[in-house]
Amino acid sequence: MPELPEVEVISNFLFDKIKNKKISNVTVNNWNLRVPITKNIDDLLKGKVINDIKRRGKYIISNIDASMAVIIHLGMSGKLIYVEDNQAQNKHDHVIFLFSDNTSLIFNDPRRFGLVIVLNREQELNFFNNLGIEPLTDEFDGHYLQKLLKNRKANIKSVLMNNKLIVGVGNIYASESLFRARISPLRLAQDLTYIECEKLAIEIKNTLSDAIAAGGSTLKDYAQPSGSAGYFQNNFYVYGKVQKPCRICNNIITLIRQNGRSTYFCNACQN
């Protein structure tokens, strides 16, 4: 599943490519995603201009004029493909946004766990009301994290992945951030000291920022709208490195399951 860095890369690309473009029409080839596509999406968007593109958590928000927004979530395997001329449609091209200059944006999703909906301003505010803090903001620091973790008896990795507390830090970046901070994923969240919280907040920011600069991580499905792959996976310390030596100490990387998810860590470096 694309996590915060991948969605940020996509949002930045779309900001450069489709901001201020007028939508000529919207074609829906498959309405049956996990959450149904807004039924009158073509009527709502035809002739409208995209004023802004931004990200909230793992959602891409395209603000349309001043009254509404298109909300897109890529789910497990979704992609947004930007094309500058007509191309043959693929099997899983579910939604096609055609612009007045004949460029188009295609939502492709083999597993159909994605989301494409249109919301008015009030609906948009309510939709995002339960999401946690953005970890790349100035507000997210050691003090904030320490308060967030107080009295939380869950393991620290599961807390980092809780989007109601902190958005966008998925499995990959939780594992990598904890390694960089030298904190074991087995630790209870409430037991982290202020110094550890400060270090972890810094390393979450560093890990996410490094991943964005590298174009994200391409493991299976993820690609940028241009078709380019990300390459942050080449810089992983622990994720996917089971039975391989730690880059820091040569200890063998350990794989365990936490809350149904794979967790990779070095039990020598992380404590």
UniProtKB/Swiss-Prot annotation:
<dbReference type="GO" id="GO:0003684">
    <property type="term" value="F:damaged DNA binding"/>
</dbReference>
<keyword id="KW-0862">Zinc</keyword>
<dbReference type="GO" id="GO:0008270">
    <property type="term" value="F:zinc ion binding"/>
</dbReference>
<feature type="active site" description="Schiff-base intermediate with DNA">
    <location>
        <position position="2"/>
    </location>
</feature>
<dbReference type="Pfam" id="PF01149">
    <property type="entry name" value="Fapy_DNA_glyco"/>
</dbReference>
<dbReference type="GO" id="GO:0006284">
    <property type="term" value="P:base-excision repair"/>
</dbReference>
<dbReference type="InterPro" id="IPR010663">
    <property type="entry name" value="Znf_FPG/IleRS"/>
</dbReference>
<protein>
    <recommendedName>
        <fullName>Formamidopyrimidine-DNA glycosylase</fullName>
        <ecNumber>3.2.2.23</ecNumber>
        <ecNumber>4.2.99.18</ecNumber>
    </recommendedName>
</protein>
<dbReference type="InterPro" id="IPR015886">
    <property type="entry name" value="DNA_glyclase/AP_lyase_DNA-bd"/>
</dbReference>
<keyword id="KW-0234">DNA repair</keyword>
<keyword id="KW-0378">Hydrolase</keyword>
<dbReference type="InterPro" id="IPR035937">
    <property type="entry name" value="MutM-like_N-ter"/>
</dbReference>
<dbReference type="InterPro" id="IPR000214">
    <property type="entry name" value="Znf_DNA_glyclase/AP_lyase"/>
</dbReference>
<keyword id="KW-0479">Metal-binding</keyword>
<dbReference type="Pfam" id="PF06827">
    <property type="entry name" value="zf-FPG_IleRS"/>
</dbReference>
<dbReference type="GO" id="GO:0140078">
    <property type="term" value="F:class I DNA-(apurinic or apyrimidinic site) endonuclease activity"/>
</dbReference>
<feature type="binding site">
    <location>
        <position position="152"/>
    </location>
    <ligand>
        <name>DNA</name>
    </ligand>
</feature>
<feature type="binding site">
    <location>
        <position position="92"/>
    </location>
    <ligand>
        <name>DNA</name>
    </ligand>
</feature>
<keyword id="KW-0863">Zinc-finger</keyword>
<keyword id="KW-0238">DNA-binding</keyword>
<keyword id="KW-0511">Multifunctional enzyme</keyword>
<keyword id="KW-0227">DNA damage</keyword>
<feature type="active site" description="Proton donor; for delta-elimination activity">
    <location>
        <position position="261"/>
    </location>
</feature>
<keyword id="KW-0456">Lyase</keyword>
<feature type="binding site">
    <location>
        <position position="111"/>
    </location>
    <ligand>
        <name>DNA</name>
    </ligand>
</feature>
<dbReference type="InterPro" id="IPR010979">
    <property type="entry name" value="Ribosomal_uS13-like_H2TH"/>
</dbReference>
<dbReference type="InterPro" id="IPR012319">
    <property type="entry name" value="FPG_cat"/>
</dbReference>
<comment type="subunit">
    <text>Monomer.</text>
</comment>
<dbReference type="GO" id="GO:0034039">
    <property type="term" value="F:8-oxo-7,8-dihydroguanine DNA N-glycosylase activity"/>
</dbReference>
<dbReference type="Pfam" id="PF06831">
    <property type="entry name" value="H2TH"/>
</dbReference>
<comment type="function">
    <text>Involved in base excision repair of DNA damaged by oxidation or by mutagenic agents. Acts as a DNA glycosylase that recognizes and removes damaged bases. Has a preference for oxidized purines, such as 7,8-dihydro-8-oxoguanine (8-oxoG). Has AP (apurinic/apyrimidinic) lyase activity and introduces nicks in the DNA strand. Cleaves the DNA backbone by beta-delta elimination to generate a single-strand break at the site of the removed base with both 3'- and 5'-phosphates.</text>
</comment>
<feature type="zinc finger region" description="FPG-type">
    <location>
        <begin position="237"/>
        <end position="271"/>
    </location>
</feature>
<comment type="similarity">
    <text>Belongs to the FPG family.</text>
</comment>
<dbReference type="InterPro" id="IPR015887">
    <property type="entry name" value="DNA_glyclase_Znf_dom_DNA_BS"/>
</dbReference>
<dbReference type="InterPro" id="IPR020629">
    <property type="entry name" value="Formamido-pyr_DNA_Glyclase"/>
</dbReference>
<feature type="active site" description="Proton donor; for beta-elimination activity">
    <location>
        <position position="58"/>
    </location>
</feature>
<feature type="active site" description="Proton donor">
    <location>
        <position position="3"/>
    </location>
</feature>
<keyword id="KW-0326">Glycosidase</keyword>
